[in-house]
Amino acid sequence: MKTPAQWKAWFESEEFARQTDYQGLLGAAYSPSGTHLRLWAPTAQSVRVDLYRKGDGGACIGSLPLSPWGQGVWGVYLPGDQHGKYYHFNVTTEWGSVTTADPYARAAGVNGARSMIVDLARTDPPGWEQDKRPVIPASKRSVWEVSVRDFSQDPASGVRNAWRGKFLAFTQQGTTLNGDGVHPTCLSYLKRLGVRYVQLMPIFDFGSVDESRPLTRQYNWGYDPANYNVPEGSYSTDPARGEVRVRECKQMIQALHAAGIGVVMDVVYNHMYRFDNVLNRAVPFYYFRQNEDGSLSNGSGCGNEFASERPMARKYFLDSVLYWAQEYHIDGFRFDLMGLYDVETMNLLRAELDKLPGGRDILMYGEPWQGGSSALHRYEANKNNLAMLNDRIGIFCDDTRDAIKGGCFNAREPGYVEGKPGSFWDIGGAVAAWCRSDKFPPHTPGQIVSYVSAHDNFTLWDKLLLVRYERPEFGAVDRAALAQNRLAAGIYLTCMGLPFWQAGEEFARTKKGQGNSYRSSPALNRLDWKRAEQFHGLVDYYRGLIGLRNAFPRLGAVDRASPNAIAFFDLEQPLVGWRLPALPGDGAWWGALCVYYNPTEQEQPIRLPDGRWKLLSDGTSSSLWRGDSRILSGEAVLAPVSATIFGLV
C-alpha cells in the first residue's frame, strides 16, 4: 500500500497525467432512451452503482458493475428513461470499499447522500429558455450580498410562511413589511434600492444543515460544500425530491433577472465540508493539496484545501463553474479564499467563461488571501500576483475596507470615518482604486471591489458602535454612528471600482456585536425588515448615492486612464477632496464631479474650483441632485462627518 507521500508523487508525475488525463463528460448523461454513468476513479479496483427509487431510504432496486473505459474512467449504460432514479457508487480501492455520491451529480436526495439522474429540461420553469442575463454596463454595477436564508426569514418580511428562507422567496412580488402595503421588502425593496447584482452566499449543497430535520434551530452560512453541482436542499420546499431544488433555484434566478438584477454566486471550491467527501471517496488524496510528507495542506483553515493545479481537479473546477453559468444563467462568481487557487487555473476559467454567449460580462472576483499556510507552489491568485491575473478578475480590497472603517480583526480600531490620524492617505488610494499606488497596482480600476462590510467580521453598524462605545446599545438610533455610516457609504460609493456591501448595511444591520455569526441563531442572522423602515433615511441615502453614481459613468470606468484623470486638492488634513471630469459622450449628467470627505466633527470651509457647481449630495441627503438644489461658486462649507458632492453645470 502506498503512503500518502507516495500517492502525492504519483499523482503529480507525468506518467499519471498521461495515463489518466480525460477531457470528456463525467457524471450522468441523460437521454430519454438511456443514461450513461461515468466516474473518474483511476485508483479504483472496481466500481459498482446501486439504484434506488427514493433519495432517502427504501430498498436498492438494482446493482450494476461499471467497466473500465480507459484514462481512469469507469462507466455503465442504463437503457430506458431513468429520470428520477437515485444512485450512489461503491468504489473499491486498496484502502477498502466506500459508498459515495457522484461528484458530478446535478440533483440529489435529502442531504445529498444519493445522486439523482435528472432530465434538466423538466426542471426548467416556464419561460426559462427566454431568460437572459441583464445587460448591466460596468458604470452601473453594484453588488448587494445576502444569504438565501437571511433574505426572507423574518416573519415581518411579508413573504408567505412556506417560502421564508427559501429560493422561492425571491419570486414573490409586492411584499411589504407585515403586509402593510406601504414599506417594501425583499424583491420589491431591491428594485426600489437600485442595486444591480445580488451576491448569494453559498447556494450549492452544503453539509452543516440536516435537510431532514426542521430548520428552526439550524443555521449555517454554507461555506462547507458537499455537492458542488447541486443546489442546497434546505432552500427548497421539498429536499426529498431532487428536481425541486433545481427548479426552484432557477425560478429565483429568473425572478431576479426579470427585475433587472444579476446573480453572483459565492463559490467555495477551496475546501470541502470534511476530508471524507465525494471527491476523496472517488479518488483518495487526489483532489486535495498535500505537503511534502503527504499530509494535508490546510491553507483554508478547514482541514483540507483543493488542489487546483492538478489536471483533473482543475477540470472538475472548470466544469462545475461553467455548468452553473450555462445551466443556471449565473451572472458572476465570487471566489472564497481565491488565494488558494493558482493563477493559471483562474485565467483559464476567465478564458472559458468568455467563450460563452455574453460570457465576457460574467463577473469574476474573489478574496485575494488564504486562511492559513498553503503548500501551493505555483503562483497564488492573491493580491501580490494581481498583475498576473486577467484584468477582468477582481479582488476584494481589504486596504479600502480597513482605511475607511478600521481593521476588521480589532473591534476597537478606528478608521478614517472614526477619525483615525493619518488614514487620509489611504483614502486617496482607494478613490483611484489603487491604480496610482505602489502597494499593488491593478491593471484597471475594474479589478478592485470597494467595500466596508461583508458577511465576515462585524457589520458596519456594529463596528462603528464598538469603536465609539465601551458598551454599545446596538439596537438604538445613534446619530453619531449614522453620520459615520453615511460618510463610509459616501466614500466607497464614489471610489472607482466595483461597489459592494453586505445586505442591510443600508439600514444599520446589527448582529449585536457578534463578529462571526456563521452558525449563530437564525434570528441573529436574518435581515430585520423593521429596521429598513426604522432607518429609512439611511436607506434613502444609499439609494441616492447609487443613482448619483449611475448618473456619472466615469466612476465605474474600467479603463486604466480614468484614475489618472482624478485631480486631488491640497487640503488641510484630514480632509480629502478631488475632481474628476466626465468623459465626452458618456451620458454624464454633469461636466465633472467634485467630492469632499470631512471626518471631523466641525464644519470645514473649502474653496471650489472655478465654475458653477450644483450641490448633489451632502452629509444628510444624497438625492439633492434629483431636484433644484443650490448652485455655488467660490466658497462652500462642508458639514461635520460628511461626504459632499458637487456637479459642474
Which functions belong to the PLM regions below?
Residues 39, 89, 146, 200, ...:
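Conserved, mostly hydrophobic/aromatic
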Residues 149-328, 337-357, 363, 374-375:
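Substrate-binding/active-site clefts of carbohydrate-active enzymes
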Residues 118, 350-351, 355-507, 514-518, ...:
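Conserved alpha/beta catalytic core and glycan-binding cleft of carbohydrate-active enzymes
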Residues 41, 84-87, 628-649:
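C-terminal beta-strand-rich structural cap/linker in extracellular carbohydrate-active enzymes
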Residues 29-45, 565-609:
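Carbohydrate-binding surface patches
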Residues 52, 477, 481, 527, ...:
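C-terminal accessory region downstream of the catalytic core in glycan-modifying enzymes
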Residues 19-24, 494-514, 524-593:
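Glycan-recognition and catalytic regions of carbohydrate-active enzymes
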Residues 1-32, 68-172:
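The feature marks proteins involved in alpha-glucan
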